[in-house]
Amino acid sequence: MNPKRCAACKYLRRRCPKDCVFSPYFPPNDPQKFACVHRIYGAGNVSKMLQQLPDQTRAEAVESLCFEAKCRVDDPVYGCVGIIHLLKTQIQKTQNELAKTQAEIAVAQTKLSQTHISDFM
């Protein structure tokens, strides 16, 4: 048994075994991280997911689960998709603004070149 229980074991009010699947990813000093993931996915499901993954990919999977769970808590309807949609909208607006600015620059350059040509005639 670990002398310091991980956040998951503290939250679940159980002993933290040496081979606890949660302890490397849910440190005791960040209990909200596990609480959020548990609220959305459940401890059993997260445990099963982690056990099915190779050790080298578990940390990334936990970070992804935490991010997705936080998004789902913040926006229960859309979750991460809401953020993706917002970013796509911002990209589209920025692309439109860039195209407009480039067109204005082209018009200004054309006027400037016409002014220089008329000055020489």
From Swiss-Prot:
Which PROSITE patterns does UniProt cross-reference here?
LOB (PS50891)
Pfam families found in the cross-reference section: LOB
Task: Report domain LOB positions.
Answer: 4-105
Matches recorded under InterPro entries: LOB
Per the similarity annotation, which family is this? Belongs to the LOB domain-containing protein family.
PANTHER family reported for this sequence: LOB DOMAIN-CONTAINING PROTEIN 23-RELATED, LOB DOMAIN-CONTAINING PROTEIN 4-RELATED
Supply the name of the protein. LOB domain-containing protein 23
